């Protein structure tokens, strides 16, 4: 048996072992933790990525222009939303108790985000950016106002419906949350099995597609610790794209990356948005926003407002 494995690619060895062992533990872990999405992004590539200039102030900012889609609709729609933070699981308290005991984070939120838009959320640490993202993917319960995400009414959402919502959303974590003892291919394979994919050839085809999107098609056999920080973040993005999301949520995705690698991640997000997937990214990196301008929402003193890039630094 060992001779057979020596003649096979490393990812294929892991794939065969997974089929034999079923690996229910990892499937359950991935399903509960990530539950990525099914609708939205078409196959594409990122090409001709240019290195950053040594002096970014001599460059003309490349303002992002969202793709205008026929039948454009709101992927996110918030009206009069107030967000309270609690450490209790979703749905474990009544709305009345949450209003009494939860910590007020943000109030009177009103905005729409459409398919194909790339939107920055910016503000100081603790200003509520992550709390908003957690509300959008139903880690925090919405108890005041109206909120619709990827076709789901957050006020009426039941706990059993959360996995269905998250299959329409791709989530990119700053701390990666990869399976460190499985290679790139198997990290993606477990997600697909956990979210209902059955056909093995379709699974392999989709994994090949998303690895090509993030320029990791030659790294399928690598273990996460063999990848650079930027490559690990690209793997996380590939994982979020597996189920073709309508919405991609990224919480400080460039926080642990060097400036050049961070710019590559922003260009990748912009390319994903051009294919019709709404991308919402929280960050405190104002230099990136100046270099790659796009719609920006500022968080300050429990409120939000849209700001032009030119006045953003004065308000933070």
What are these regions (language model features)?
Residues 182-190:
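Short coil-to-helix segment of the ABC ATPase nucleotide-binding domain corresponding to the Q-loop/switch region
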Residues 248-251:
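Catalytic Walker B motif of ABC-type/P-loop ATPase nucleotide-binding domains
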Residues 242-246:
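A short, proline-enriched helix->beta-strand linker immediately N-terminal to the Walker B motif
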Residues 223-227, 231-233:
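Conserved ABC ATPase signature
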Residues 1-5:
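Short, small-residue-biased leader/transition segments that mark boundaries at the very start
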Residues 137:
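Helix-to-loop junction immediately C-terminal to a conserved catalytic motif
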Residues 145-153:
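Conserved ABC transporter NBD signature motif
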């Amino acid at each position: 048996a060992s001779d057979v494995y020596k003649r096979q690619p490393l990812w294929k060895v892991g794939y065969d072992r997974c089929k034999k062992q079923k690996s229910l533990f990892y499937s359950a872990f991935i399903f509960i933790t990530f539950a990525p999405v099914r609708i939205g992004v078409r196959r594409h590539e990122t090409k001709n990525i240019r290195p950053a200039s040594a002096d970014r102030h001599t460059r003309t900012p490349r303002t992002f222009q969202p793709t205008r889609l026929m039948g454009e609709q709101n992927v996110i729609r918030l009206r009069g939303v107030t967000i309270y933070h609690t450490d209790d699981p979703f749905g474990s308290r009544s709305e009345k108790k949450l209003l009494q005991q939860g910590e007020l984070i943000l109030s009177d939120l009103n905005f729409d985000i459409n398919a194909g838009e790339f939107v920055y959320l910016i503000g100081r640490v603790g200003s509520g950016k992550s709390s908003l993202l957690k509300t959008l993917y139903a880690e925090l319960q919405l108890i005041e106002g109206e909120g619709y995400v990827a076709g789901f009414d957050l006020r009426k959402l039941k706990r059993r419906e959360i996995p269905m919502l998250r299959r329409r959303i791709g989530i990119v974590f700053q701390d990666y949350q990869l399976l460190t003892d499985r290679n790139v291919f198997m990290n993606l394979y477990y997600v697909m099995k956990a979210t209902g994919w059955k056909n093995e050839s379709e699974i392999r085809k989709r994994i090949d597609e998303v690895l090509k999107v993030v320029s990791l098609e030659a790294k399928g056999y690598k273990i996460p610790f063999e990848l650079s920080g930027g490559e690990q973040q690209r793997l996380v993005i590939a994982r979020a794209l597996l189920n073709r999301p309508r919405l991609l949520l990224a919480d400080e995705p460039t926080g642990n990356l060097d400036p050049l690698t961070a710019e590559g991640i922003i260009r990748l997000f912009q390319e994903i948005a051009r294919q019709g997937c709404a991308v919402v990214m929280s960050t405190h990196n104002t230099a990136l926003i100046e270099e790659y301008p796009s719609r920006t929402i500022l968080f300050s003193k429990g409120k939000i407002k849209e700001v032009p890039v030119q006045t953003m630094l004065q308000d933070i």
